[in-house]
């Protein structure tokens, strides 16, 4: 975040991270990649399992599997490769395209956040934003 925006946040008693950029890539109407799906890919790479990745992220196995299925349907090749269970256990790993998409997505997130941090519009938005929303009227 630009220095002016940070100073404005602190002066207003607000968290300097109040404006966050969320990058989503779409395939048709389906979110092909977003912050949560990138976190899931990282967890699968770390744990080697869809179920373990879901547990680490506090997601049900069904939710985790649906997200993996959605990602695999949105790209020219699957991002996650699975192996069936059995006596040796199953598992999951990122494909080469999965590693590439994850790396490119994280780099794009970083670049877009840096560009927004330097934008004077961000300081103006922070200056106009309330620290907390007003209560609703009953």
Report residues per predicted region.
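Basic, amphipathic "hinge/linker" alpha-helix immediately C-terminal to the N-terminal HTH DNA-binding motif
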Residues: 82-107
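Residues within the DNA-recognition helix of helix-turn-helix
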Residues: 67
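C-terminal regulatory/oligomerization modules of transcriptional regulators
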Residues: 118-138
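Short helix-boundary/capping micro-motifs
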Residues: 44-53
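Alpha-helical linker/hinge and terminal dimerization helices associated
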Residues: 104-123
């Amino acid at each position: 975040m630009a220095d002016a925006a940070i100073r404005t946040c602190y002066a207003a008693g607000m968290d300097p991270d109040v404006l966050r950029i969320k990058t989503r890539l779409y395939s048709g109407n389906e979110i092909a990649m977003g912050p949560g799906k990138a976190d899931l890919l990282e967890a699968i790479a770390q744990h080697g399992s869809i179920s373990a990745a879901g547990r680490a992220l506090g997601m049900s196995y069904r939710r985790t599997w649906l997200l993996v299925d959605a990602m695999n349907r949105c790209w020219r090749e699957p991002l996650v490769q699975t192996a069936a269970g059995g006596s040796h256990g199953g598992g999951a790993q990122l494909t080469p395209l999965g590693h590439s998409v994850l790396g490119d997505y994280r780099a794009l997130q970083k670049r877009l956040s840096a560009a927004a941090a330097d934008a004077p519009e961000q300081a103006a938005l922070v200056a106009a934003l309330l620290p907390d929303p007003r209560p609703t009227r009953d």
